[in-house]
Design a protein with these regions (language model features):
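A conserved catalytic-loop motif detector
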Residues: 1-61, 65
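Soluble, non-transmembrane domains of envelope/secretory-pathway proteins that act on or interact
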Residues: 7-11, 48-50, 56-182
Length: 182
C-alpha cells in the first residue's frame, strides 16, 4: 500500500432501452407487486404501514428451479432495494418461502427504513413516457381486431379488448392469419 492508484472506474453509460420501453417495463413490474400473485409484499406492507403501502411500488420476484434461492427486488421512483433468501449450502427452501417469508421480511425492512428516514421512498409516481403508443388489442391475440382470410373465406376476428402499450409509433399490429409461424 504505497498510495499508487491501481484502477479508477470511469462511468460510460450506454442507453440500452428507449424511454418508452423502460416505462412500459415499469408498468408491467407494478403488476408484479399489486397483483399479489407471486409475492405477499403489498399485503404485508399494508398491514404494517398502510400509508407506505400506497407508494408507487414496482418489483420483480425470482426463484431458482429447486427453490434454493429467492429474490424480491422493489423500487419506487426514488429508491430501489433488493432482498435474497437462501442457504449458503444451496439446500432448498420451503415452497412459498419467497412468496411469504421474503415478502414479509422486505415489508418490515422497507418500513424500518421509512421509520429511520421518513419520506425516503417518496411520493412520486412512475409514468409512461409520452412516446408510448396505447393500442386497444384483443385479449385473445394481443393484436388489433381485424379481418383475416382463411382458405378463401374472410373471417372477422373480434372479442374483448384491453389496452396494450407499445414502444413504436404504429402501436399494435392488426390481427393476421399465419398458421404455424416459424
Amino acid at each position: 500500500t504505497d498510495g499508487r492508484l491501481v484502477y479508477e472506474h470511469k462511468d460510460e453509460p450506454v442507453q440500452v432501452y428507449s424511454k418508452a420501453t423502460a416505462t412500459i417495463m415499469q408498468s408491467l413490474l407494478r403488476d408484479v407487486i399489486s397483483s399479489r400473485i407471486t409475492s405477499s409484499f403489498q399485503t404485508d406492507l399494508t398491514t404494517i404501514n398502510p400509508s407506505l403501502a400506497r407508494a408507487d411500488w414496482i418489483g420483480k420476484t425470482g426463484t431458482t428451479n429447486e427453490d434454493e434461492n429467492m429474490w424480491l427486488m422493489l423500487s419506487t421512483p426514488r429508491l430501489t432495494l433488493g432482498g435474497w433468501l437462501g442457504h449458503d449450502d444451496n439446500r432448498p427452501l420451503a415452497k412459498g418461502a419467497g412468496h411469504y417469508r421474503n415478502a414479509k421480511y422486505m415489508a418490515y425492512l422497507v418500513n424500518a427504513i421509512q421509520q429511520a428516514e421518513p419520506g425516503i421512498w417518496g411520493n412520486e409516481r412512475f409514468s409512461l413516457d409520452q412516446s408510448v403508443t396505447k393500442s386497444q388489442v384483443l385479449k385473445s391475440t394481443g393484436e388489433k381486431p381485424g379481418k383475416v382470410t382463411i382458405n378463401g373465406k374472410e373471417v372477422t376476428v373480434s372479442g374483448s379488448t384491453v389496452t396494450s402499450y407499445w414502444a413504436t409509433k404504429e402501436g399494435a399490429p392488426v390481427t393476421t392469419y399465419r398458421f404455424a409461424i416459424g
